[in-house]
Every structure is written in structure tokens, then in C-alpha cells.
Swiss-Prot record:
This is DNA gyrase inhibitor YacG. Zn(2+) binds at residues 20, 23, 35, 39. The keyword Nucleus does not apply. NCBIfam families: PRK01343.1. GO terms for biological process: regulation of DNA-templated transcription. It comes from Rhizobium etli (strain ATCC 51251 / DSM 11541 / JCM 21823 / NBRC 15573 / CFN 42). The gene is yacG.
Length: 70
């Protein structure tokens, strides 16, 4: 029983703390990778309003592909 408590005390967190992508403060486990619910909702709002976008080429023939070497 005593050994179980010692083993449980040595459990390491799954994720390393990172700075919040919005404000730079240390991240919070509950809101990972953000520091707070506010920063999490700011980021979600940006995604929902289209502030973040993944660039795509209108025509694949005009897309800038790296030269392939055979």
C-alpha cells in the first residue's frame, strides 16, 4: 500500500507547459494550450469569423509546386 502511494506521487504531467499562443503567459492544464478561458475563446472567435484561413490555390495548375526531380 505504501509503495502505491510513492508510485502515484511520481506521476509526471502528460504535457509540458507552453506559453499561451494569445498572450504568452504559461498555459493552464484546464485550458491547454491557452492560459485561460478568455484566450481560448478569443482564438475560437478568430477561427469562426474567418480571421484564420488556410491558403489554397484557386486552380491547381497555377499552384506553386516545388520541382520534382526524377
Amino acid at each position: 500500500m505504501l509503495e502505491d502511494k510513492k508510485a502515484a506521487a511520481k506521476v509526471e504531467p502528460l504535457r509540458k507547459t507552453r506559453p499561451c499562443p494569445e498572450c504568452g503567459k504559461p498555459s493552464n492544464r484546464e485550458h491547454y494550450p491557452f492560459c485561460s478561458n478568455r484566450c481560448r475563446e478569443v482564438d475560437l472567435s478568430r477561427w469562426l469569423t474567418g480571421s484564420y484561413a488556410i491558403p489554397v490555390a484557386d486552380d491547381e495548375t497555377k499552384a506553386d509546386y516545388p520541382d520534382e526531380e526524377n
